[in-house]
Amino acid sequence: EDRVVSNLRAVGVKVWEKDPETGKQIRFTECGGHFALSLDGVGEGFKESDTPHTLEFKTMNEKNFKAMKNLGCKKSKPIYWAQCQIGMHLSELDWCYFFAVNKNTDEMYGERIKLNKAEAKLLVSKAENIVFSALPPSKLHEDPSNWQCKFCSYFAVCHGCKIPEVSCRTCSHVTPEKDGTWTCAKGKPVETCSEHLYIPQIMPKDFVVVDAGDDFVEYEDQDTGEVIRNQGNSQEIFDGRMK
């Protein structure tokens, strides 16, 4: 990032890497603070426009870099494009300068991305729905062979047998509040504890609920016939399935 910033300054772009009020990275929050995004900086003085741009820097392998050059950010890396859109929306700027470096050859690629207000608002709304939802979002596709699912980081959780890590967000007792805090129905400090109870809807599809109460859920593993009782022992009984 330092080299990229130096290169931008060398061609006359004024770059702010830190928030002048805090001295830290420029950061924005939504959803009461549950959702946050940081910028790599803000630049002003690009030859195409004097208006300030958010800055987003990425390094890529050869394959991803070639796709970026050929297709552009939105088509080759839609998740990066979405990040740029949210950054512009939260910072109230209309342009982003997206910069990528091929980590194998040091070749560079730059692209100006324009704010799409409707898309940006939709992305933030989607984040809010996920943050405050009591249940995990539905699968993008029911067919695990779909290409979007095959390349998703959560494929093993969504379509396979992997169980998410033990955390307050995967616990039935915990609720994210609108003011950015968390509430535990057990009256505990919001940190992983011995009373963790998985939200049943995030368990593997071969786990069928056969009994449940306020502080326990029993599952039958359809593959083995084993009955597993989740009652404050999530880490112990599911540890092997989290890997």
Where are these regions (language model features)?
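Metal-dependent nuclease catalytic regions and adjoining charged, substrate-binding loops involved
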Residues: 67-81, 86-187, 192-243
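Short, solvent-exposed aromatic-acidic interface loops
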Residues: 59-62, 103
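Generic beta-sheet signal
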Residues: 18, 57, 99-101
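Metal-dependent nuclease catalytic cores that hydrolyze phosphodiester bonds in DNA/RNA
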Residues: 1-54, 61-63, 68-71, 194-197, ...
